Amino acid sequence: VSSEIGTLERTQQSELINFTTSGSYIKLGIDFNMYKNWTGMNNQVYLGLRLSNSIYKHYINNYVLFRTEQIWSDEIISSGYSTGEIPNLNAQWIEFLVGMKVQIIKNTYMGFSLRLNRLLSNNNDSEKFGLLYIPGFNRVTDENIFGSSFNYTLTYSIPFRWKKSK
């Protein structure tokens, strides 16, 4: 059984838009260890599955109107109908992952994983802008519900099993 939690605040600037996303996420799932350890070792090469949820908000700082017959310089819009906060957003997705963890000291591991995500649902009803970024999922577009990421981790495993004293 595996769980991950996180929080994120990220401001992103592109050619046409500047926005800030802030929120938190939780991921719950399982890891299946595919590696048989030598005696005394506790390393992992694993496949995993996660169900994830994120609660977040967008803040559109400014954007540039795109016009095909642009003659003058770009007009940057920093106030008006489409700027400002888009609150109370949430999204759910599933993650498939492959990774490895190496024990560096007792109950502490260092590792990395490659994750493939598929967006299951989101509640973006906003007429202002579509989804741009989801904490824990990463970048989103209107045409694509898939994503990927590479993570490196430092993990502490809470020991739930204790040795019986004789």
Regions found by a protein language model. Give the residues of each.
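Outer-envelope beta-barrel architecture signal
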Residues: 1, 24, 41-45, 92, ...
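Residues on the lipid-exposed face of transmembrane beta-strands in outer-membrane beta-barrel proteins
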Residues: 28-32, 49-53, 96-102, 112-118, ...
